[in-house]
Amino acid sequence: MNARLATAILLATCPFATALADTKVVLPDSQRFADTGRDFLLETTIPGDFKTLEGIVWGLLTLSSKRPDKRFSSPFFPDAISSTSHREGAQPLYMYFRGLRQDGSKVILRFTGDANRYLNNTAAIQELVKGALEATIRLHTTKSTTVYYEIDGQIVEEWDA
């Protein structure tokens, strides 16, 4: 009888445990970035238990502001580019995200042209944005994963900054 009761309790609480699960991501520690510019990408969590790589990237782009440790910055929102000429009319980066494709150890992040406000900004902003995206992807795949960026259907090989 006790085993049945324990099983019933476990089954009843299982959906709540899943709802409270977090996903590991990598975000920049703004103080470390300002101090040394090195070793500033650190592991933290966002709320939600994302199962696919596309879900994890979507969660990173949309929920990074909900991180538990506020010393980490969330470089995917207009505040991150407020000091640059790209800020006028900028939306959060997730508004420009069109999904991803995987082919073996290759991941292609797909965006519309307006994503260049973040992806082709100053070198520092590019480091924060792309660094967090690429490190999070490698956290959930293999370290040898290569990340490419597709803007309006074209793979971008070189960035301005």
Question: Which functions belong to the PLM regions below?
Answer:
Residues 14-16:
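N-terminal signal peptide c-region/cleavage motif recognized by signal peptidases
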Residues 19-161:
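Bimodal "functional hotspot" detector
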Residues 1-6:
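Bacterial N-terminal signal peptides that target proteins for export
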